[in-house]
């Protein structure tokens, strides 16, 4: 299954919820379950990275001498 390079946060979260429902249904084979679990781990990491990036951006905005200003946030791996 080919996927885009990265999904946005909402798409990743929706896909993760779908995977959890499939795993909880108990209807997947062992191989299918392992594949779904691996994909779920990848999606979880993508979601965590998105949340971390958003949190850091909020901190940058709030830590500018009490004034609301935005500074560029240099993220690793965005253009990989």
From Swiss-Prot:
It is found in: Cytoplasm. GO terms for biological process: DNA catabolic process. HAMAP family: Exonuc_7_S (MF_00337). It catalyses: Exonucleolytic cleavage in either 5'- to 3'- or 3'- to 5'-direction to yield nucleoside 5'-phosphates. Heterooligomer composed of large and small subunits. The keyword Nuclease applies. GO terms for cellular component: cytosol; exodeoxyribonuclease VII complex. Its EC number is 3.1.11.6. This is Exodeoxyribonuclease 7 small subunit. InterPro entries: Exonuc_VII_S (IPR003761), Exonuc_VII_ssu_sf (IPR037004). One of its GO terms (molecular function) is exodeoxyribonuclease VII activity. Gene3D superfamilies: Exonuclease VII, small subunit. The keyword Nuclease applies. Belongs to the XseB family. Keywords: Cytoplasm, Exonuclease, Hydrolase, Nuclease. The gene is xseB.
């Amino acid at each position: 299954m080919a996927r885009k390079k990265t999904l946005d946060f909402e798409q990743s979260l929706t896909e993760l919820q779908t995977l959890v429902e499939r795993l909880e249904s108990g209807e997947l084979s062992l191989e299918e379950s392992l594949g779904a679990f691996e994909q779920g781990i990848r999606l979880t990491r993508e979601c965590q990275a998105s949340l971390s990036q958003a949190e850091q951006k909020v901190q940058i905005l709030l830590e500018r001498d009490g004034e609301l200003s935005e500074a560029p946030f240099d993220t690793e791996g965005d253009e990989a």
